[in-house]
């Protein structure tokens, strides 16, 4: 669709009531290339952050609550957006990676006037909506453990057990894990027995087998809740190829650039799709550019649908030309 991705009404017109599971965005980098046809590229620092937050908020109503975002940009701008630009605190988000695209064609600069190392990479911020990690930190402590933990805490207080004494008795420094809500885990039998032996009749009088049975009953309920939680997590599949957060793809050159300022390799975008969207997933591209996102979906197995927004009429023509050349079928205007 030819429209403005920072306008919620335009996004709603494109997507309707559909919910995207993946947002792949290659927005303006703030490199001052408006004269070269890159709209909104003369925005810098806080103005660029405002622009980024505007398009993110505009599409949020059409994104699944466990969706994933991939946003390309300069490293400094992406980190400022995350920490200072309002993104990190906009809702509950889970940072995943700063993906580095190694373009394999960097060339050093032998110049006294060049005050930095020559860049040969581009960067992508990858995050997921919602709480994605099921951990047992104090903030995520499950209240169902209270009956077990309260007994342990009560016995420890009664006999004066502290971290240093525990280490003396058991040889490990696990006081916070066994007797507080911070990363709480159930105490192993051999350590519990050492406490019973050390304190005798003064504390830890419950027999371990019965105590463990009580814990196992609670754990069954906990595991059920954990399973339900995992079912709500963002889609992610890293089994289709071996990957790290450094992606090695040659830079796009020649006619394959399609007159775009920061073109991405089709196969690299396909990797994102395979990793963060199911075969029938809906993907939204708020800056469609030369249409790479559409081609990337067509090159892989599955029935993914890409909905793209592009502000420039010039690029709309390029997208249509490129699609028709790739698919060998005429594009159809719907509205």
Regions found by a protein language model. Name each.
Residues 314-325:
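Short alpha-helix adjacent to the SAM-binding motif of class I
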Residues 1-316:
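Core catalytic lobe of class I
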Residues 324-335:
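Conserved phosphoryl-transfer catalytic core
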């Amino acid at each position: 669709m030819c429209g403005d991705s920072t306008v919620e009404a335009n996004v709603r017109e494109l997507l309707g009531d559909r919910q995207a599971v993946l947002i792949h965005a290659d927005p303006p980098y703030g490199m001052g290339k408006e004269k070269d046809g890159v709209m909104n590229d003369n925005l810098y620092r806080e103005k660029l952050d405002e622009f980024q937050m505007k398009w993110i908020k505009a599409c949020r109503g059409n994104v699944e609550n466990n969706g994933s975002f991939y946003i390309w940009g300069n490293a400094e701008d992406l980190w400022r957006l995350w920490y200072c630009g309002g993104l990190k605190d906009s809702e509950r988000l889970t940072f995943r990676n700063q993906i580095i695209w190694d373009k394999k064609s960097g060339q050093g600069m032998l110049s006294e006037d060049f005050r930095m190392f020559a860049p040969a990479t581009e960067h992508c911020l990858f995050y997921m909506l919602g709480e994605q990690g099921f951990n047992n930190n104090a903030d995520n402590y499950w209240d169902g453990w209270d009956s077990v933990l309260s007994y342990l805490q009560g016995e420890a207080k009664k006999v004066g057990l502290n971290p240093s004494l525990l280490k003396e008795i058991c040889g490990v420094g696990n006081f916070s894990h066994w007797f507080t809500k911070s990363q709480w885990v159930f105490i192993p039998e051999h350590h519990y027995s050492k406490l019973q032996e050390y304190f005798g009749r003064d504390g830890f009088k419950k027999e371990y087998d019965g105590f463990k049975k009580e814990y196992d009953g609670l754990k069954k309920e906990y595991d059920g809740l954990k399973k339900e939680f995992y079912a709500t997590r963002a889609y992610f599949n890293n089994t289709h190829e071996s990957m790290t957060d450094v992606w090695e793809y040659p830079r796009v050159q020649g006619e394959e650039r399609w007159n775009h300022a920061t073109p991405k390799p089709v196969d690299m975008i396909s990797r994102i799709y395979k990793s963060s969207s199911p075969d029938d997933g809906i993907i939204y591209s708020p800056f469609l550019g030369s249409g790479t996102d559409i081609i990337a979906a067509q090159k892989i197995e599955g029935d993914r649908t890409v909905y793209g927004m592009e502000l420039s009429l010039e690029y709309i023509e390029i997208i249509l030309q490129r699609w028709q050349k790739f698919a060998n079928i005429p594009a159809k205007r719907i509205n």
